[in-house]
Amino acid sequence: MPIVDLVPGHCDALLRFFEALPEGDRTFIKEEVTDPSTVRSWAAGEDGVRRWLSMDGGDVCGYVALYRLPGWSDHVGEIRLVVAPGRRGGGLGRELARHAVVQGLGSGLAKLVVEVVAEQGAALALFTGLGFSGEALLRDHIRDRSGQLRDLMVLAHHVGETWSGMATVGVAEDLDRPEG
């Protein structure tokens, strides 16, 4: 499935995607993703965040965003990833996350971070498989919609170090080529 930039024409499909997510999944998304004005502002590019979708026909199957942090952390980007439940486990999340990593490298970011609820084993495996490692465990850091406190893990990828290592062995140019 192609990965495309989020544009205004995708707003309705993206809203349907977020509305179809189980309530438990939406608990761990920072933004109010079912608010049409939020999604429209994203598509208009008003906040400077880069966002991409994986589309199957007119339906969104996955979403990834790359937020450049402000101020003294402007060398750091935060990745936020959501994949439709029916599309999980097939490599789509990895493809989207990898796309964000490559775009982060291309925009000059030196470090990427992702926040993952500690119980989300598949997400932890996905990001560690892409070179991320644990930097922090924040105990009882988030509260789900039922009021239960959950641990949050912060994973980081020092992309500059990784990129220079890949360039040394000649595989950097293969990073964004489709596998097959």
Language model regions located:
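A short beta-loop-alpha structural element at the N-terminal edge
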Residues: M1-R16
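Conserved GNAT acetyl-CoA-binding A-motif
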Residues: G104-V116
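Conserved acetyl-CoA-binding loop-helix of GNAT-fold acetyltransferases
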Residues: G89-G106, A125-G129
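Conserved catalytic-core motifs of GNAT/GCN5-like acyltransferases
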Residues: V113-V116, T128-R150
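Glycine-rich acetyl-CoA-binding "A-motif" of GNAT/NAT acetyltransferases
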Residues: D59-G62, A122, L149
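Acetyl-CoA-dependent GNAT
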Residues: P8, A20-L21, T27-G86, A97, ...
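C-terminal "cap" of GNAT-fold acetyltransferases
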Residues: D140-G180
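Conserved beta-strand-loop-alpha-helix junction that forms the acyl-donor binding cleft
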Residues: R88, V114-L124
